[in-house]
Amino acid sequence: MTAELVIDVHDLQKRYGERKVVDGLTLAVTAGEICGFLGANGSGKTTTIRMLCGLIKTDGGGGTCLGLDITKAAPQIRLQIGYMTQRFSFYEDLTVGENLYFVASVYELADRREAVRAIIERMGLEDRVDQLAGELSGGWKQRLALAACVLHKPKLLLLDEPTAGVDAKARREFWDLLHDMAGEGLTVLVSTHYMDEAQRCGRIVYLSDGKIVVQGTPDEVAHGSGLVTYTATGPDADAAARKLRNMPGVEAAAVFGSSVHIAGMDRAALEKAIASPEGGGGLKWHEVAPELEDVFIHLLSKPAKAAS
């Protein structure tokens, strides 16, 4: 049985002047999936999300979101999605409860008080109901924003770097909520720069210059990258990393405590570098599996080439 496609778009195009911000993007997201959107700033993530919900028009291509044509049915699409921007976009001079009741009124929910009560309980906002939104910490603001986005029980959640600037504990709790809702059938498309968040996605899509460069599960992307990675521990890790960064074949060299980690595509060149007295000689090296961070640093350093 074929899984239901909540997002199904083909060859999306968007230009600003001479610059192609989105260039032939094709994307399919199935019901109940958490799909991570990754890429450098300016890679086309936000523009794609805005085209999906009809906030900006495409310059080419098309497709459906929730079975509705993104070029013709934007108002109907927006009624069935929750869209959360990186910037907090609710009223800071209203309380948490007042903000949520206002959103319930905008969506003309039948039992607004019950809907607000239920979402406050689910999001753990009981102790914040009477607090002004402007007085909330970053983590609590994002939790309020998420509550407002799902108050009307959307079928699709579009999140644009929702946890930027939020502490690690709040980010983890936010993602726990996302997984709970995805388990109930909510579909999520979320952009992020955090590798720990990318690991929590069922599938990740990496964009560069408006093109999809690679996609798959986190393990598929990491193991299919072709990268070779080595790590070593020693007292001179910082000095070794500085030397190795300038050696042929070493695309990245990073220090983690007393360990140095290197990555590249050319195994022979890497092995020569770590054996060289001018590089990693004197440290005991062993090969390790590449991680997502290795892959994305590698992709950031390369010109965009669309995935086949």
State what each model feature region is.
Residues 153:
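Conserved catalytic motifs of ABC-family nucleotide-binding domains
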Residues 174-265:
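ABC transporter nucleotide-binding domain
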Residues 93, 132-136:
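Conserved ABC ATPase signature
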Residues 157-160:
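Catalytic Walker B motif of ABC-type/P-loop ATPase nucleotide-binding domains
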Residues 61-72, 77:
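Conserved ABC transporter NBD signature motif
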Residues 101, 105-128:
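Conserved ABC ATPase "signature" region
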